[in-house]
């Protein structure tokens, strides 16, 4: 049930070796759902469905190097890393050095059986629409969120200008209400209008100073 309602599952417990039962249960769950492990937009290894990694690769929009085409084509046809190492007389450490950058860039993922698979990007889609829909899905369950939190959640593939444009779009279509401050928090917050209580009691701030060095300073130019 948890996997059916989660887009990404980060393997925190098993990576730290603190919960053997969680490790066993996770192995059986990812096998049952045929999940793959790869790098998300924040650089964390996560379990997710193949289609999700296709979306992430589209958002990254990073071209492959010509010298990487041979290994990517190999893992389009088969998923056996041992066969690749045998054909190329390659040690396991050499193989890891070869595939690690491709895993970080999202071009390769690993399946639940230990094999590798090349990620083919989504075709005939508008990149901006994909990014916008990804950000919408990212923030839709947060009743209150700051711009800096959105920036950290989105990852390095999103420029501050893109986040700013999406936040403006969310205001226009009613997904979020405009920035406000909450007690004990110094950052500007955005919130879901339908999830916030006591909207009528929110008071206007007297003054607000945004440092010029803030990467999202341009957002506030129109406010």
What spans do the regions from the language model cover?
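Long, low-complexity intrinsically disordered regions
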Residues: 1-223
């Amino acid at each position: 049930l948890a996997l059916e309602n989660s887009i990404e599952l980060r393997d925190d417990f098993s990576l730290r070796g603190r919960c053997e039962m969680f490790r066993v249960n996770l192995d059986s769950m990812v096998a049952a759902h045929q999940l793959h492990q790869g790098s998300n937009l924040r650089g964390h290894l996560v379990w997710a469905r193949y289609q999700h990694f296709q979306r992430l690769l589209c958002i990254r929009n990073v071209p492959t190097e010509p010298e990487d085409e041979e290994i990517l084509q190999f893992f389009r046809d088969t998923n056996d890393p041992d066969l690749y190492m045998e054909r190329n007389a390659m040690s396991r450490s050499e193989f890891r050095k070869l595939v690690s950058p491709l895993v970080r860039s999202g071009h390769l993922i690993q399946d639940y059986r230990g094999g590798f698979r090349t990620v083919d990007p989504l075709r005939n889609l508008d990149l901006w629409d994909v990014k916008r829909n990804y950000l919408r899905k990212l923030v839709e369950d947060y009743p209150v969120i700051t711009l800096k939190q959105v920036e950290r959640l989105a990852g390095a593939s999103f420029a501050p200008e893109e986040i700013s444009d999406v936040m403006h779009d969310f205001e226009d279509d009613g997904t979020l209400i405009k920035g406000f401050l909450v007690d004990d928090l110094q950052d500007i917050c955005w919130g879901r209008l339908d999830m916030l209580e006591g909207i009528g009691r929110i008071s206007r701030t007297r003054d607000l100073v945004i440092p010029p060095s803030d990467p999202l300073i341009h957002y506030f130019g129109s406010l």
